[in-house]
């Protein structure tokens, strides 16, 4: 599918640049460097046009970037869903003696087809890529659930990608 092509292009372009940006369709996608300077992140990068209006319930259409720059510094909303996964995470936190309030309900929207990308900072090496597709049986889940945030993998020399769908 076209998503595979987009991911391949993103990975290729991420490996070419030593700064924290890459270009898609003449739009500069601007990421950020982590506070410990070990990783770069590009959060909430759209891979398809929003599936709303006449695009609802249709096959995704690749994103047509029209901006000169896109700031990829925050997670995009999760797709529409029930709150059961949040309750599950809170139960896990309680089970391990943690604070259940650490887990908060994600923002949700029908406009939810986004990628999050993490990579090591200061390298132009070809790197392995790990793509996470969250679970939830198409009823719950989001690409930045605590167990899907990719900064730890990136600090170990891996490009990590999560997909919202």
Language-model segments: residues:
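Non-catalytic accessory segments of hydrolases
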Residues: 19-165
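Hydrophobic h-region of N-terminal signal peptides that target proteins for export
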Residues: 8-17
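Sec-dependent signal peptide recognition
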Residues: 1-9
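Absolute protein N-terminus
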Residues: 1, 18-19
């Amino acid at each position: 599918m076209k998503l595979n092509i987009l991911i391949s292009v993103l990975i290729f372009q991420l490996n070419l640049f030593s700064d924290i940006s890459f270009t898609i369709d003449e739009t500069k996608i601007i990421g950020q460097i982590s506070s410990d300077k070990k990783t770069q992140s590009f959060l909430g990068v759209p891979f398809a046009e929003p599936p709303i209006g006449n695009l609802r319930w249709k096959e995704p259409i690749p994103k047509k970037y029209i901006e000169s720059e896109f700031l990829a510094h925050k997670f995009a909303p999760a797709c529409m869903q029930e709150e059961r996964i949040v309750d599950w995470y809170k139960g896990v936190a309680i089970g391990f003696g943690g604070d259940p309030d650490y887990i908060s309900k994600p923002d949700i929207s029908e406009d939810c087809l986004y990628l999050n990308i993490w990579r090591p900072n200061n390298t132009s090496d070809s790197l392995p890529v790990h793509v996470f597709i969250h679970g939830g049986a198409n009823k719950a889940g989001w690409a930045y659930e605590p167990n899907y945030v990719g900064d730890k993998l990136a600090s170990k020399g891996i490009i990590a990608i999560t997909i919202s769908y």
